Every structure is written in structure tokens, then in C-alpha cells.
């Protein structure tokens, strides 16, 4: 036999090759936090130095690195470092007035993040900010590195605005000398600022319209520049950020996503890597309570056979679980429509204490029974003597009609107390109609009489006419 190995057969096998573990990513903590959009790197480094961030339960140190799977705590929230594999996304949002560019506003004002598309496993990061009265273009992205690069002053990204200005007091329009001063530079509270470009695009009787360009993103920079010269800004709208323009067809409060080709062009313009490598980001932790491994300890030397489950007595545990017991009367299986209200829904101990107590009696709902002495009750149940209330020989037959077939009925020729004769069928014959209390007001009226027939009172019947209709009594 030769020692040459046999070629592999095409048979199936349950054996699996040992999978090679993917290398864990490791990055600086402040970079991971910035990638998640929690702030600038400089501000995050300051927070790390102040001991406001924890990694795996320990206070983080400046310059430390984190790996995928590490738990990071910041501002009372917990995150887990994980790899970011999805490509960057950029959103164009036409911001209306009245919205603030923040996630949570202490004053309860509406924010721009309330109307944005929902993301899974990522979050929108605002590229710059617009104050509550400024409208127009607002860029948001899922790439924290791209957002920081576009906001950094060293990138010198142009921001273009359209502004409506009221001229200083005593002047009809904004003078050219004032515009030249704004392009040279004006001293503000946080340093010198200027407009890179100022273009007059129109005017009215009381306002002037301008198109201005700045390369910095200071807080309310455009408004403060005009206010430093005695002008008042009444309208301010951003129309361009770098190479991204606000689409004309995009309405206020609506958003649209930037194509991937333009996103890659932005990264190239900012000298970022074309193909974004794997990076670490933060994913929020969903609060879940995981129970520890169960351990049962039994003391065999104890005569009472006490057991302890995870350092807790099983007797105590059963006492705690007893509160979840639901005692009820076992009923037959119905269609599931009726719910019994007399079952016990208290704990076992409370039910044992209440065992001697009777069930609670509930008052009937919507009780429409009439009170005693009500006239309606009297009229409904009062039947004059000698008036039958049902067919002959019926079990519910009333007085004067014979309640039982073996009993003899009264003489049909005799008159009753109301002046009517008793017939075999009380409602079939005309002179045997029942009288009710309401008829006592007109005792001579018989609604079932025939024309010309005398009533018991000796008065002519009021029925008759063309259609033999019932009529009320007529008096001369």
C-alpha cells in the first residue's frame, strides 16, 4: 500500500474548522467619544481629566484606549464600544423657525432631532448649529469624524447666508462704508470677526437684503457682526455649507439624504480617507436584568432541612413568591366572554386571613325597579275585580275567568261590578273588554263596542261611523 494521501471525498461532515477570531479594534477614548458625536475632542479630553467618564466601572484616564466590548459610562448613560461598519450618511434638513439644534432642551422647546428619520445602531450628529430664529440649511451626519472636520476652523468651510437688515437710525439704507468695515474686521467679545464676502441683492423702503459668507462657525456670528454697527437683523437664512446647497424644492421642516457620491466628495475635500476603515463607536445599552447562576445549599445536619438558594433561605423565597399566587374558584370553560368578579386576587397570606369573610355583595347596576307606592306600579299591577287577564283555562288566568280547568266559570249571563258580561274569550267579544283605572273617568266609554249596542251604563255606544272607528263619549 502506498503512503500517498487520499484525495478528499465529497461527503458531508459535521466537523467545523476552527474559526479565527477577528482582531479587536482599539482606539483612544476621546476619539471614540467624538466619533459617537458626544462632543469635540478637546472638550472630551477636558471631561476625561475631570473624572466624569468611566470605562468598565473605573474612572477613565487621559490618553487611555478602549477596545470593542468595553462599557463606557457618561452623564449617567451606559454605552458599549462596537465597530462601525456602515458607510457615512449625510442629511440635508431645511430648518424652520422655532426649533433649537440640541437633543434635549431644558425649556421644552421643539428640537430638530424630533422630525429626523430614525436610525438603528447610529445617531445623527449636527454639523454646526443654527439658533432658534435662523432658518435654512442644516447638515447632519452619522460620521463623527466628518462632522468634526467640517466644523473645525482650520478647514475654512464657507457658510453662505441671506440676511435682511434694518439700517441704523437716521439712515435710509446701509452705507457702503459700513460694508467695508465689516469686510475688514470688527472686534467682538470673543475676538476679531469679519465677512469674507458681502453682496447687496435688494432693498425695500425700510430694509436691505444681503448675501454674506463667513468661514467660521461662532455662536450668532452673523447677527453680532451687524449689531456691532447699529444694524438690526430681521431675517437670517443659511443657503450653502461648503459645496452643499439648499435645494429649492425642499420645504421647511423636511429633509433629504445626500447621495453617496457627494459624501465621498466631501471626505476627499477634507482630506479624509476615501474608504472609511473600521472604527469604534458607541451603542447605547438596553437595560436588562440578568440573574446570577443558581446555587442550592442544603444543610443536612439540620433537622428542619433548611435549604439556601444563592445565600437566601428557600422558606423566605417561597414566602416572597406567595404574593404572586392567584386563588380563584375553578369554573367550567366557557367562551371567554364572562369574567368572574368573585375570585380572589390577593396574596396567599392575605387570602388565608380573609377566608372566614363572606364574599362582597355587589349592588345590581342600572336598577330601574320602581319604589313602593309609585303610581306607575299601582297602574301596572292593579286589575279590577271580575276582569280576566288571560284566556280561559290558562294557568295565568285571572279572577272571573277560572284559573283551573276543573273549576266552573261564572254564569256568562251575569253582569260583573263594572257592568260588563263575562264571555269565554274576553277580548273576542265586544262587551267583555277589560276596564282599566284610566277608563273610570268615563265609565260609559267602551272602545270595543258595536254601533247601536247598549253599554252596561245604558248609554249608546260611541263607536261606528264610516270605518267603524272608536270614538270618545259625546255629551249633549
Curated annotation (Swiss-Prot):
Sequence ranges of Polar residues compositional bias: 371-380, 408-465
Superkingdom: Bacteria
GO MF term list: 23S rRNA pseudouridine(2605) synthase activity; RNA binding
PROSITE patterns, A to Z: PSI_RSU, S4
Basic and acidic residues bias (residue ranges): 314-333
Family: Belongs to the pseudouridine synthase RsuA family.
Protein name per its UniProtKB record: Ribosomal large subunit pseudouridine synthase B
UniProt organism field: Xylella fastidiosa (strain Temecula1 / ATCC 700964)
Amino acid at each position: 500500500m502506498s503512503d500517498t494521501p487520499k484525495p478528499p471525498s465529497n461527503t458531508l461532515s459535521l466537523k467545523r474548522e476552527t474559526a479565527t477570531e477577528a482582531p479587536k479594534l482599539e482606539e483612544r477614548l476621546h476619539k471614540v467619544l467624538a466619533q459617537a458625536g458626544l462632543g469635540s475632542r478637546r472638550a472630551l479630553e477636558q471631561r476625561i481629566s475631570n473624572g466624569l467618564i468611566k470605562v468598565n466601572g473605573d474612572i477613565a484616564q487621559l490618553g487611555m484606549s478602549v477596545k470593542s466590548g468595553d462599557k463606557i459610562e457618561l452623564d449617567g448613560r451606559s454605552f458599549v464600544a462596537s465597530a462601525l461598519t456602515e458607510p457615512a450618511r449625510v442629511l440635508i434638513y431645511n430648518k424652520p423657525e422655532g426649533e433649537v439644534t440640541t437633543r434635549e432642551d431644558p425649556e421644552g422647546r421643539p428640537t430638530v432631532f424630533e422630525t429626523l428619520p430614525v436610525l438603528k445602531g447610529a445617531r445623527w450628529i449636527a454639523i454646526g448649529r443654527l439658533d432658534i430664529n435662523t432658518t435654512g440649511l442644516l447638515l447632519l451626519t452619522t460620521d463623527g469624524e466628518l462632522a468634526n472636520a467640517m466644523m473645525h476652523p482650520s478647514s475654512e468651510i464657507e457658510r453662505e447666508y441671506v440676511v435682511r437688515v434694518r439700517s441704523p437710525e437716521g439712515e435710509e439704507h446701509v452705507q457702503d462704508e459700513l460694508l467695508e468695515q465689516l469686510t475688514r474686521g470688527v472686534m467682538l467679545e470673543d475676538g476679531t470677526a469679519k465677512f469674507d464676502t458681502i453682496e447687496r441683492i435688494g432693498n425695500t423702503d425700510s430694509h436691505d437684503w444681503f448675501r454674506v459668507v463667513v468661514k467660521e462657525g461662532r455662536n450668532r456670528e452673523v447677527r453680532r457682526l451687524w449689531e456691532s454697527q447699529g444694524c438690526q437683523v430681521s431675517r437670517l437664512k443659511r443657503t450653502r455649507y461648503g459645496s452643499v446647497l439648499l435645494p429649492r424644492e425642499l420645504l421647511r421642516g423636511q429633509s433629504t439624504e445626500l447621495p453617496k457620491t457627494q459624501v465621498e466628495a466631501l471626505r476627499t475635500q477634507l482630506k479624509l480617507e476615501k474608504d472609511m476603515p473600521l472604527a469604534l463607536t458607541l451603542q447605547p445599552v438596553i437595560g436588562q436584568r440578568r440573574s446570577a447562576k443558581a446555587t442550592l445549599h442544603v444543610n443536612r445536619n439540620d433537622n428542619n432541612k433548611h435549604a439556601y438558594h444563592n445565600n437566601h433561605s428557600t422558606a423566605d423565597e417561597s414566602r416572597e413568591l406567595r404574593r404572586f399566587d392567584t386563588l380563584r374558584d375553578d369554573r367550567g370553560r366557557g367562551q371567554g366572554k364572562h369574567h368572574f368578579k368573585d375570585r380572589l386576587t390577593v396574596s396567599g397570606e392575605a387570602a388565608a386571613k380573609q377566608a372566614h369573610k363572606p364574599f362582597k355583595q355587589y349592588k345590581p347596576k342600572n336598577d330601574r325597579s320602581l319604589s313602593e307606592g309609585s303610581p306607575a306600579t299601582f297602574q301596572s299591577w292593579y286589575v279590577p275585580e271580575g276582569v280576566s287577564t288571560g284566556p280561559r283555562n290558562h294557568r295565568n288566568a285571572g279572577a272571573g275567568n277560572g284559573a283551573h280547568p276543573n273549576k266552573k266559570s261564572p254564569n256568562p249571563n251575569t253582569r260583573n261590578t263594572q257592568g260588563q258580561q263575562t264571555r269565554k274569550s274576553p277580548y273576542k267579544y265586544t262587551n267583555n273588554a277589560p276596564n282599566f283605572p284610566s277608563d273610570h273617568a268615563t265609565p260609559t266609554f267602551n272602545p270595543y263596542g258595536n254601533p247601536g249596542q247598549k253599554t252596561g251604563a245604558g248609554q249608546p255606544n260611541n263607536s261606528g261611523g264610516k270605518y267603524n272607528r272608536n270614538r270618545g263619549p259625546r255629551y249633549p
